[in-house]
Amino acid sequence: MPPRVSRFNLPEPAPRVETGTVKAIAVIPARIASTRLPRKILREIDGRTMLDRVYNAAKGAPMLADVIVATDSQEIMDVCNRHGWNARLTSDQHRSGTDRVHEVAQTVAADVYVNVQGDEPLARPEHLNTLLELMRDETVQVGTLKTPCGKEDVANPNAVKVVTDKTGRALYFSRSTVPYDRDNRGDIAYFKHLGFYAYRKPTLDRFCGWPESSLERSERLEQLRFLENGVDIYVAETPYDTIGVDTEADLKRVEEILRSRN
């Protein structure tokens, strides 16, 4: 019997695309203090830290000019220095990873800044390539990713759902089950939002200058601040799912997926 193929473990894709003319830099916000899973970014998964896996996934994306770890922790800086990774020590006052990306953007010039979450150990170069293909359209100010939502995640509030129009423009992001299947048809296509973002600097500057928005507070989803302020977010689809690690259970699930690849 052939090995089971899941949305986390798919066949290798076609050869990489050529680097475009957009200068893009990935920033990995990396803080040591995490409430639900302390020091999670330095936790080892199958012999490698979470940060190691995320950093090297980003380094494998040929469309990126550079990858920078942005941290408020000297311990993480020391880890990066030992590995020869590019890293910046940033303020410990930031409310979100986006604010940390914004600080880096003030001193490192690029056309596009990509926010790669440090707690996404299943990140792949293909995620970033797909996102940067989207950003080749200069009218796109903010880009992100979606993937078909598995049945186990449709009603899961920790799996954020996204609804888009026919052009890929996001209509809404929610922890609720959207769209709602009023007539119980059972044929609704649900999409899970993946936490990779690409921003052009002027729009990133505006975002960090706005106060927290009403919908953002309600859903605890900062991307809703863009939508409430009239900024379109375009969403590209990828077949590669990921898991954001917030708990020990998430960590074990990732370990199982990685073992299945070996």
UniProtKB/Swiss-Prot annotation:
One of its GO terms (biological process) is lipopolysaccharide biosynthetic process. Pfam families: CTP_transf_3. It is an enzyme of class 2 (transferase). Its EC number is 2.7.7.38. Its main location: cytoplasm. It catalyses: 3-deoxy-alpha-D-manno-oct-2-ulosonate + CTP = CMP-3-deoxy-beta-D-manno-octulosonate + diphosphate. InterPro entries: Cytidylyl_trans, KdsB, Nucleotide-diphossugar_trans. Belongs to the KdsB family. This is 3-deoxy-manno-octulosonate cytidylyltransferase. It comes from Koribacter versatilis (strain Ellin345). The gene is kdsB.
